[in-house]
Amino acid sequence: GKTTVVFHYPAGSERLVKSVNLVVNRLLQQRLDMEQEIDTLTHTATFTFDICGPSSAFTFTTKVETLLLLTPGETVNVYVNPFSDAVRVRNTHFPNHKLQTVSKIHADGYYAAFNNYANNERLRNPPSMDVWYSDLTDYKASDEEYVRKIKEKYRKIMSDLESKDIPLSVKEYYEYQIKNETVMAFGNAYYLRKRNYRTVHKVKDGDIPFKFTNLPPALLSEIDSLFDMTDPRLLEGGNAEYLIYGVNDSDSDWESVLGDRGKLLYDLKDADLVYIPRIK
């Protein structure tokens, strides 16, 4: 459906920002990368485009970087305060004379609760499987130990997330993000353990005295005991690219595990994704 996003800027902000760049991930369609000048009379920048399902978008060259979730057919108004970062920086340097913090944006629309929280709040210790830097992907672990550690960490993080007092839409976003990261950990056991070895031993190049492999189908299938990785709602969460890459770029034998259930994920092999910053 045709979706419209209108960015509203306060009068006088043209000294700080002249235009808005908006990038939209559309998964089954080509990624959009658009730019609009801010109208000097209305102080707005309007984008209209087609999306076929819930899509993530962000701005990255304005004074305020925003992360948005959008749904087809809606009009979303985003009221931007380009001075919010200046207040944050000032308060950092003058902690004894802090100004009242101000919201970066105020948005309406279907995902209003999520978009306002994601851009204005700061969750301490945001949940993550942290597949790149934790000991979760310990190179010394056997395949069975590797899977056991993943499952234990997944269950602990999901339990912690359930206890957090945050909007439901934000909780779901994190839930799907954690699941996407878990797919990455299952599907890329070879690469992640090899990377862990190089990190631990500070070895960038050269041979490694370990033979790393991906998980066999019997262990890959244990992900089914955690969640349904073919649930299309996972694409609405953070790190959706982990779900796609964890299946299509891993050389793991997912077809033996998923069969026809994985058709959507296979079809997304060439999805034109761009990095979306995680909620801070």
Feature map (PLM): residue ranges:
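A non-transmembrane, solvent-exposed segment enriched in polar/low-complexity residues
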Residues: G1-L168
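Oxidative protein folding and maturation machinery
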Residues: N91-K280
